Amino acid sequence: MSAAAYMDFVAAQCLVSISNRAAVPEHGGAPDAERLRLPEREVTKEHGDPGDTWKDYCTLVTIAKSLLDLNKYRPIQTPSVCSDSLESPDEDMGSDSDVTTESGSSPSHSPEERQDPGSAPSPLSLLHPGVAAKGKHASEKRHKCPYSGCGKVYGKSSHLKAHYRVHTGERPFPCTWPDCLKKFSRSDELTRHYRTHTGEKQFRCPLCEKRFMRSDHLTKHARRHTEFHPSMIKRSKKALANPL
C-alpha cells in the first residue's frame, strides 16, 4: 500500500470511528458500544471520565482533518511508461539489410523502402537496446554492393562505385604522364601514383624537415618522434587545404 493510500485509509477509519460514536443508540446495545457515544453530561462514571472521552473525540477529528489537508498536497503521479509504448531506437533508420555484413544474404533496400515510422518496434530492440543502438550506426550505411557473394555496405554511393570496380576490373582513371600506360579504378590511387613521376612530396613532418608523397607514410614516420601527437598531422593537412 502506498503512503497516499495509507493516509486515505487512516482518515477513513477516523471518520468511521467518529460516525460510530455519534450513531450509537441511547437504549440497548453492548456496554462497549455505549462507551463510543459522544460525550454528554449524562455520561455516568461507569462509562469513564467524560473529559477523557471528549479528548479522544477531538484527537480523532484533528487526525482526520490533518490527513485530509495533506491530501491536498499529494504529488501528482506521472503515468508509467510501458515497454509496449517505447519507440525503437533504430526506427525509420532502415531495415536489417542496411547493416554491414560479409554474407550478403539479405537484399538491399532503397531509402523509400525503409521501415515505417509508425510501425511497432521489434522485440529485439526492446529487450536488447544495445543491439538496437549498434544497428542504428550500421544502418547509416545504405549502399550495398550488388555483386553476388559480396556483402559490403557503404555510407556513400561514390564509395560503392569505387569498390564495385574491384569486381568489374574497370579502371577509368589513366595516368597522363608520357609513356605511362597505367590505369586506376580510383582517382586517389591515380593521384598518389602521379606523384611518383613528379617527385612531389607535399606531406611534411611537423617535427622535422622530411617530406613524403603519401599521408600514411608521413604518419608512420611521425610516430617515431616521442613528442608526436595526432593533432599535429591534422593541422598540417588543414594548412595544405587552406594555404591562404
From Swiss-Prot:
Originating organism: Sus scrofa
SUPFAM superfamilies listed in its UniProt record: beta-beta-alpha zinc fingers (SSF57667)
Keyword Repeat set for record: yes
Protein name: Krueppel-like factor 9
Subcellular location: Nucleus
UniProt similarity note: Belongs to the Sp1 C2H2-type zinc-finger protein family.
Biased segments, Basic and acidic residues type: 32-51
Transmembrane segments: none
Signal peptide: none
Residues modified as Phosphoserine: 122
Segments for region (Disordered): 24-51, 80-142
Assembly and binders: Interacts with ZZEF1.
Pfam families: zf-C2H2 (PF00096)
Zn finger intervals (C2H2-type): 143-167, 173-197, 203-225
GO BP annotations, alphabetical order: cellular response to cortisol stimulus; negative regulation of keratinocyte proliferation; regulation of transcription by RNA polymerase II; rhythmic process
Single annotated GO MF: DNA-binding transcription factor activity, RNA polymerase II-specific
Described function: Transcription factor that binds to GC box promoter elements. Selectively activates mRNA synthesis from genes containing tandem repeats of GC boxes but represses genes with a single GC box. Acts as an epidermal circadian transcription factor regulating keratinocyte proliferation.
Chief location bin: nucleus
A cellular component annotation (GO) from this entry: nucleus
Record keywords: Biological rhythms, DNA-binding, Metal-binding, Nucleus, Phosphoprotein, Repeat, Transcription, Transcription regulation, Zinc, Zinc-finger
CDD domains documented for this protein: KLF9_N
